[in-house]
């Protein structure tokens, strides 16, 4: 799966200049970088929420699943929200059990806490199969237990569906735990990409090294 080069400009200022990359099925790509480095803009353009400049088409994939930073819930039960994205009730039950949502299945989803809403949104996405999945800070609102369970589910989902998965994360520990590859963004550019051990332990760019040192890696 190829992501073509593209740019994104706001008010005549280029906030993202992406050179393109080839994604492999069955792999998790962690996107890291400081705030304002272009990570979420990258995710939003790939998902189709934001258009790239000059009608560029960075991605030609039939099925893309996207979980934004700010998840949403319709004013219906948690279970009904999940079944909007698939009618497999057994699958919904399995995922609710895995992410400890069963006690909340009849609760109105728009009254869930931030962490509960994030878990519901992740389950809702996993009700379907996609060629590409994009998760933007999916566990930021979760506690440690829910984060651990979610990471296991994400890994299993990728293994089962053989999708390519882009994980935008502020947690280098999370990138180290579940990613296969790491993409480092700096000031709107992809500066370094490769296997996680190479990027996190032996970065080639000075900017990457400085970022990792600042994060205590």
What are the functions of these language-model segments?
Residues 71-84:
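Conserved catalytic motifs of ABC-family nucleotide-binding domains
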Residues 89-104:
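Conserved ABC ATPase "signature" region
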Residues 108-112, 116:
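Conserved ABC ATPase signature
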Residues 133-136:
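Catalytic Walker B motif of ABC-type/P-loop ATPase nucleotide-binding domains
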Residues 169-170:
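H-loop/switch region of ABC-family ATPase nucleotide-binding domains
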Residues 197-217:
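C-terminal boundary and immediately downstream tail of ABC-type ATPase nucleotide-binding domains
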